[in-house]
């Protein structure tokens, strides 16, 4: 469990971030050899840690100094209790995290290769039972928030409705389109910012993103889908960003990769808090890149989320 005193920052003004998204337990193992079909390999260890993109981003935003409310669903089981306890320890408002006895808590099975790159299988469990409770909770919270973070880990009707309601209120909607599926394009018109990684950008556009030129081509397609700003997370390369009047690229800070799990969530959290604080698009991307770089230097998902002071120190 995190040492809250050392990772959370006290700000004169703390923006309020609403995260509506997935809450999972992570089962993580590493191996020197990714198995071929029909092949059995040996894992080096097994770690059971809290995760889920929504929960990871909530923790990341909290450590960046924001006040954070999380809306989602867990199972009424041992993993659910563990997930809830960790969120509480991180200072997250979990009054609208619902326990459901009809499904088990979501699980992510994560395989790390020798370079720290991850391969993930999700069993969404209770996340997929999110319904009108989550929609109503979001409607009550939205008038007071400075930004909304969403992903694609809950049922489409929930994520789409929450994004639409926030859009009507003029609240910045930051959309992380993962996991990728054909539902994503129904949410995009209600998002202000879409933040795919390279694989997700390729899924949405058909463009294989390997450099700034291909990122620019993919961004042009995404902008035509109705979103106003595109930020493509490009791992160790950095991030490309584009809006109607601005585009650019921010390089990642070189760092030894230990575990790439949740690096994108760290990026998204730092970026969203920066947008809520009215920083420029480029400055928000710079903070996102710094947070992502710091996250890959540690093992785990929520445990690797950096503190605000670490992010600021890295880019100063």
Predicted ranges, named:
Residues 58-67, 112, 273-278:
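Alpha-helix C-terminal capping segments
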Residues 1-73, 78-92, 257-258:
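Glycine-rich phosphate/adenosyl-contacting loop at the front of the ribokinase-like
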Residues 2-17, 181-187, 212-316:
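Conserved phosphate-binding/catalytic region of the ribokinase-like
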Residues 45-46, 71-76, 95-105, 176-178, ...:
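Beta-strand->loop->alpha-helix junctions that form or flank phosphate-binding loops
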Residues 147-217, 236-239:
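Conserved beta-alpha-beta core of the PfkB/ribokinase-like small-molecule kinase fold
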Residues 2-4, 91, 128-133, 173-179:
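Short gly/ser/thr-rich secondary-structure transition/capping motifs
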Residues 73, 95-100, 110-147, 152:
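Conserved phosphate-binding/catalytic loop of the ribokinase/pfkB sugar-kinase fold
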């Amino acid at each position: 469990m995190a040492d809250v005193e050392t990772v959370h920052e006290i700000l004169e003004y703390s923006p309020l971030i609403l995260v509506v998204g997935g809450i999972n337990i992570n089962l993580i193992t590493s191996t020197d050899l990714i198995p071929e079909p029909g092949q059995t390999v040996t894992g080096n260890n097994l770690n059971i840690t809290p995760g889920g993109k929504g929960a990871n981003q909530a923790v990341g935003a909290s450590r960046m100094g924001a006040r954070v409310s999380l809306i989602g669903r867990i199972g009424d089981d041992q993993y659910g209790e563990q997930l809830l306890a960790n969120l509480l320890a991180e200072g997250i408002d979990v009054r609208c995290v619902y326990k459901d006895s009809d499904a088990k808590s979501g699980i992510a099975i994560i395989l790390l290769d020798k370079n720290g790159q991850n391969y993930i299988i999700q069993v969404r469990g209770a996340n997929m039972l999110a319904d009108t409770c989550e929609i109503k909770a979001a409607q009550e919270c939205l008038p007071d928030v400075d930004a909304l973070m969403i992903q694609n880990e809950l049922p489409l009707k929930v994520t789409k409705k929450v994004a639409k309601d926030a859009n009507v209120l003029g609240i910045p909607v930051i959309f992380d389109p993962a996991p990728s599926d054909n539902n994503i394009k129904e949410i995009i018109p209600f998002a202000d910012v879409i933040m795919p990684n390279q694989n997700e950008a390729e899924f949405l556009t058909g463009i294989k993103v390997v450099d700034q030129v291909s990122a620019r081509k993919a961004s042009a397609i995404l902008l035509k889908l109705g979103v106003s700003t595109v930020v493509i997370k490009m791992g160790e390369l950095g991030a490309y960003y584009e809006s109607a009047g601005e585009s650019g690229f921010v390089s990642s800070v070189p760092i030894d990769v230990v575990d790439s799990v949740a690096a994108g969530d760290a990026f998204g959290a730092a970026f969203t808090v920066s947008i809520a604080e009215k920083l420029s698009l480029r400055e928000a991307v710079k903070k996102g890149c710094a947070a992502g770089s710091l996250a890959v230097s540690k093992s785990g998902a929520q445990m690797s989320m950096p503190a605000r002071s670490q992010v600021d120190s890295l880019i100063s």
